[in-house]
Amino acid sequence: MEYGGVKMLKHGILGLLNYGDMTGYEIMTVFRDSLNYFWQAQTSQIYRELQGLEKNGWIKSTHIKQENKPDKNLLSITEEGKKELVAWLKDDNGKSFMRNPLMMKTFFRGECSIDENIDFFKNLPERETVFPEGTEKAKAISSEYQKYAPDPLKALYWKFTIDFGIRYEQLLREWSEQCIKTLEEIKNENTDN
């Protein structure tokens, strides 16, 4: 099966269900507190993918009746779903395609004034943050979920993604500062002439 360019959301959901059975709401909550830092998805997208995963036979749904509460559907990964997840994880033929709207806009920012661009770069780190609630909150959420991890070694990889996000934010701040410095130097040279 070819994975290059294929939407990754379904594999993210399979990965979450591989940790344990969940309802659609629980998947959305865990997704929001973990994968959403690097792979954004709307609730409607997740539910649409769940339907496709069930149709493919990669997950199954068990209807559970509850007293004094609405019934719920508990979702679990099937053996076929586990095989698909592992095949996707082992596939290293496809290159991760980088589509970065920030870089596209930066490439053409010469159409804006230096002052507008200085403002753009000053606001960039806050606007492009990976962790809107702060890195400490992200670390705390990751630590909380790690308590429920079926295997501490698997939870280590969650930490790796948090670390990547922290380093990305640091890189973005440093890069923005350098862009501002360069633009201010150009601005000062132009006013000196």
Q: Which residues are covered by each model-predicted region?
A:
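Heptad-repeat amphipathic alpha-helical coiled-coil interaction surface used
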Residues: I118, P125, P132, K139, ...
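Acidic interhelical loop/turn segments
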Residues: A138-F160
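Basic helix-turn-helix/winged-helix DNA-binding cores
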Residues: M1-M98
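Amphipathic alpha-helical coiled-coil segments and their boundaries
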Residues: W39, I114, F121, E128, ...
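Alpha-helical scaffold segments that form or flank carboxylate-/histidine-based iron centers
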Residues: Q45, N73, F108, N123, ...
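Amphipathic alpha-helical dimerization/coiled-coil segments
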Residues: A87-G134
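Long amphipathic alpha-helical coiled-coil segments
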Residues: Q178-N193
